[in-house]
Curated annotation (Swiss-Prot):
This is Tissue factor pathway inhibitor 2. GO terms for molecular function: extracellular matrix structural constituent; serine-type endopeptidase inhibitor activity. Finds in a complex with ABCB1, TFPI2 and PPP2R3C; leading to the dephosphorylation of ABCB1. Its main location: secreted. GO terms for biological process: blood coagulation. Glycans are attached at residues 116, 170. May play a role in the regulation of plasmin-mediated matrix remodeling. Inhibits trypsin, plasmin, factor VIIa/tissue factor and weakly factor Xa. Has no effect on thrombin. InterPro entries: Kunitz_BPTI, Kunitz_BPTI_sf, Prtase_inh_Kunz-CS, TFPI-like, TFPI/VKTCI-like.
Amino acid sequence: MDPARPLGLSILLLFLTEAALGDAAQEPTGNNAEICLLPLDYGPCRALLLRYYYDRYTQSCRQFLYGGCEGNANNFYTWEACDDACWRIEKVPKVCRLQVSVDDQCEGSTEKYFFNLSSMTCEKFFSGGCHRNRIENRFPDEATCMGFCAPKKIPSFCYSPKDEGLCSANVTRYYFNPRYRTCDAFTYTGCGGNDNNFVSREDCKRACAKALKKKKKMPKLRFASRIRKIRKKQF
């Protein structure tokens, strides 16, 4: 220790450093969207190798037969490897995952918005309205689009890893598991740890899981009646 530095100042600096590291640990890590949202690519060769890719439309890892050369990075040897890489992709309603179709041959194009799964935002495009009865990723304005498609948010501390603490007690507590979206029991030692620590499972659910289960109200659009048929399949 620097003899010229007061003891109190050293303790304060140590406390601030630990607090900053704790805050950083609460933030969710990257979701690998640049890999997981790449389209399925079999490659040009003719081998039949069992692989797994993240399917943006079902929001799950699925099997495919890889040709053996080229392709892209959305290509995993096992389901577990795919799930480990892509589970952080935020879940959105099915209609918000659909590709946008541009009606180049229609007249009277109007400004619409679609949800971009890669950027997780709503973006402007011009639609001719040729397929008004088709279920599409198409909304009349940005607010309607974001209101229905934007991923549900939970407090940042819900992403903090399970932390049993630093002491020697054996206290049953609960933490939110963001991967499986469940509140699980763990043994807390009585001191230290982080804010992802709840006295009861219900407290954990109220803080971290309740917002994820709340259903969003379907906007009143031309294709709303058909979209209702797929609501049961939403995550």
